[in-house]
From Swiss-Prot:
Subunit record text: Monomer.
Gene transcribed to yield this protein: gltX
Protein name: Glutamate--tRNA ligase
Organism phylogeny: Bacteria, Pseudomonadati, Pseudomonadota, Gammaproteobacteria, Alteromonadales
PROSITE patterns: AA_TRNA_LIGASE_I (PS00178)
Pfam family for this entry, one: tRNA-synt_1c
Residues where ATP binds: 239
Entry-linked HAMAP family: Glu_tRNA_synth_type1 (MF_00022)
Motif 'HIGH' region boundaries: 9-19
Organism expressing this protein natively: Colwellia psychrerythraea (strain 34H / ATCC BAA-681)
InterPro entries in alphabetical order: aa-tRNA-synth_I_cd-bd, aa-tRNA-synth_I_codon-bd_sub2, aa-tRNA-synth_I_CS, aa_tRNA-synth_I_cd-bd_sf, Glu-tRNA-ligase_bac/mito, Glu/Gln-tRNA-synth, Glu/Gln-tRNA-synth_Ib_cat-dom, GluQ/Sye
Protein's cellular compartments: Cytoplasm
Catalyzed reactions: tRNA(Glu) + L-glutamate + ATP = L-glutamyl-tRNA(Glu) + AMP + diphosphate
Family the UniProt entry places it in: Belongs to the class-I aminoacyl-tRNA synthetase family. Glutamate--tRNA ligase type 1 subfamily.
Keyword Protein biosynthesis appears in the UniProt entry: yes
Keyword annotations: Aminoacyl-tRNA synthetase, ATP-binding, Cytoplasm, Ligase, Nucleotide-binding, Protein biosynthesis
Length: 470
C-alpha cells in the first residue's frame, strides 16, 4: 500500500505558520517514503468558510512549493458520501437519533459536574425507539462504554484513553450536515490516508475518530501529533506575537526556502545542523525524530536564516523573488542593471528582499532630492573641486567597469592630495542619493555612465547653492 499523508486546512482564515509546518512535515514524510500527499479543504463550516481563505491557502502552498499529488478535495462536494457513512453507522447500531434539546444536554452536563462526574451527554436516547415524529434530532455516534482506545502516536508514544471518558459525539446536526469528526474519518478512509500528521490540539479528537473508523470497518491510520508553536511569552503563537499568514512573510521579503528551513527546525532537528536544502530535508526528516515539547517562534532566527539564503542562493533565483518586490514598490526595472547583479552586491547588506528593493531604487529611478543628512555632511563647499575633477575623469572613461572607475576616483584623490573618502563619499551621495551603498566602483558600474555624470552635475548645483548661501 502506498504511504499517504494529507494536509486538511479549514478555509476560515489564512495559512498560518502552524498550518504551514504541519503541511511541510506531512509533505516531507510522503516525499521521503515515495508516497502521496493529499490536499483537502475542510469547508463544511459554511458560515465561516470563504473563497478568499481557500485562495490564501492555495497561494501559500504554491509559494512554498509544497506540491500535492492529489486534490484539492473539498468536503462540501462529498455530502452524499458522508450521509452514506452515517446511514451505515445507524444500520449497524453504531449511531442513533438524539432528540434532546441543547438546553437538556446542558442540564445533563451540569448534573454530572455537580456529582463530580465527567461532563457529557448521558445517553438518554442511546437505545430508545420511541422516536417522536415532530421533533428535530441530531445523529450521535454510539461510543463504546468499556475498554480503552490506544493511540500509537509516532511523536508522543502510546496514549491510552478510557472509553468511559468519551461522549456520544454528534456526527450529524439537526439540519443534516455532517460534523468534523465524521467527515475527517470518512475522508481519511476513502483517500487511503496511512499517516495523519497534525497539531497536538487534535489529540482529544483522535480516540473518537478511531472508534468511528472501527465502527465503519475501516483501517486506522498511524498518527503523529506535533507540539504547538509558542510565542516568546510561552503562550500559543497568535497574531499578538506577530504571527501572520504565510503570504505576509512573502510580502515582508522572506524567501520561501528560508521560511521552510526555519519551520522544519520548529519541532525537529538533525544534530546541530541549522541549514537544510529541500533535498536534505527529504532525506533526513523523520516523524519519529520530532520533539515532544513545544517550540518557540523566534523572528530574529528567521531573519538570520533568510539572510543566509539571500547570500548563498543563485542570484538569478533570488532576483526572481526580488522582481516581485520591485513591482510591489512600483519600481520599473526595465531600464537599469540586471536584478541578479543587484542581488550580488546588496544581499549581504539587508535582512529581507523588501529592504533590498527599497535601497536599490536609485539604480532604476532618478531621485528628486538627496538625503539631507548626507548632503550636510558630505556635499560641503570644499568638495566642489574634487567633484568637478572626478566627473571629468569618469566622463572620459571608455571602459565603464569597476576597475577603471576605481582608478579614476583614486587618481582624483592622489592629484588633489586627498584621502579616498574625501572624493568617494561626495560621489556616493551624488550617485545614489544617500551616504550608504555597496562598494562605490561596483555601484557606479551598474549605473549608466551618462546617468552618473548627470547626477554629479545635479549634486554640484547643490554644492554651488551652499557656497552662495555662505
Amino acid at each position: 500500500m502506498t504511504l499517504t499523508t494529507r494536509f486538511a486546512p479549514s478555509p476560515t482564515g489564512y495559512l498560518h505558520v502552524g498550518g504551514a509546518r504541519t503541511a511541510l512535515y506531512s509533505w516531507l514524510y510522503a516525499k521521503k517514503n515515495g508516497g502521496d500527499f493529499i490536499l483537502r479543504i475542510e469547508d463544511t463550516d459554511l458560515e465561516r468558510s470563504t473563497q478568499a481563505s481557500v485562495d490564501a491557502i492555495m497561494d501559500g502552498m504554491n509559494w512554498l512549493n509544497l506540491e500535492w499529488t492529489h486534490g484539492p478535495y473539498f468536503q462540501t462536494e462529498r455530502f452524499d458520501r458522508y450521509n452514506e457513512a452515517i446511514e451505515q453507522l445507524i444500520a449497524s447500531g453504531n449511531a442513533y437519533r438524539c432528540y434532546s434539546t441543547s438546553e437538556e444536554v446542558d442540564a445533563m452536563r451540569e448534573e454530572a459536574k455537580a456529582k463530580g462526574e465527567i461532563e457529557k451527554y448521558n445517553g438518554l436516547w442511546r437505545d430508545r425507539t420511541d422516536h417522536p415524529a415532530d421533533k428535530p434530532f441530531v445523529i450521535r455516534f454510539k461510543n463504546p462504554l468499556e475498554g480503552d482506545v490506544i493511540i500509537k502516536d509516532m511523536v508522543k508514544g502510546d496514549i491510552a484513553i478510557s472509553n468511559g471518558q468519551l461522549d456520544d459525539l454528534i456526527i450529524a446536526r439537526s439540519d443534516g450536515t455532517p460534523t468534523y469528526n465524521l467527515t475527517v474519518v470518512v475522508d481519511d478512509w476513502d483517500m487511503k490516508v496511512s499517516h495523519v500528521v497534525r497539531g497536538d490540539d487534535h489529540v482529544s479528537n483522535t480516540p473518537k475518530q478511531i472508534n468511528i473508523l472501527r465502527a465503519l470497518g475501516a483501517d486506522v491510520p498511524q498518527y503523529a501529533h506535533i507540539p504547538m508553536i509558542l510565542g516568546d511569552d510561552g503562550k500559543r503563537l497568535s497574531k499578538r506575537h506577530g504571527a501572520v499568514g504565510v503570504m505576509q512573510y512573502r510580502d515582508d521579503g522572506f524567501l520561501p526556502e528560508a521560511l521552510l528551513n526555519y519551520l522544519v527546525r520548529l519541532g525537529w532537528s538533525h544534530g546541530d545542523q541549522e541549514i537544510f536544502s529541500r533535498e536534505e530535508m527529504i532525506e533526513l526528516f523523520d516523524l519519529k525524530d520530532c520533539n515532544r515539547a513545544p517550540s518557540g517562534f523566534n523572528t530574529d532566527k528567521l531573519i538570520w536564516v533568510n539572510q543566509h539564503y539571500m547570500k548563498t542562493m543563485d542570484p538569478a533565483y533570488v532576483a526572481e523573488h526580488l522582481a516581485w518586490h520591485m513591482a510591489d514598490q512600483g519600481i520599473n526595472t526595465e531600464n537599469g542593471p540586471a536584478l541578479a547583479d543587484v542581488v550580488r552586491i546588496q544581499a549581504d547588506r539587508v535582512k529581507t528582499l523588501k529592504e533590498m528593493a527599497d535601497i536599490s531604487r536609485y539604480f532604476y529611478e532618478d531621485f528628486t532630492e538627496l538625503d539631507a543628512k548626507a548632503v550636510k555632511k558630505h556635499l560641503r563647499p570644499v568638495v566642489k573641486e574634487p567633484m568637478i575633477l572626478v566627473k571629468e575623469k569618469l566622463a572620459a572613461l571608455t571602459d565603464w567597469s569597476p576597475e577603471p572607475i576605481h582608478a579614476a576616483i583614486n587618481d582624483t584623490a592622489v592629484e588633489l592630495e586627498l584621502g579616498m573618502g574625501k572624493v568617494g563619499m561626495p560621489l556616493r551621495v551624488a550617485a545614489t542619493g544617500g551616504g550608504n551603498s555597496p562598494s562605490l566602483d561596483i555601484t557606479l558600474a551598474l549605473l549608466d555612465q551618462s546617468k552618473v555624470i548627470e547626477r554629479i552635475e545635479q549634486a554640484l548645483v547643490v554644492v554651488e547653492a551652499r557656497i552662495a548661501a555662505g
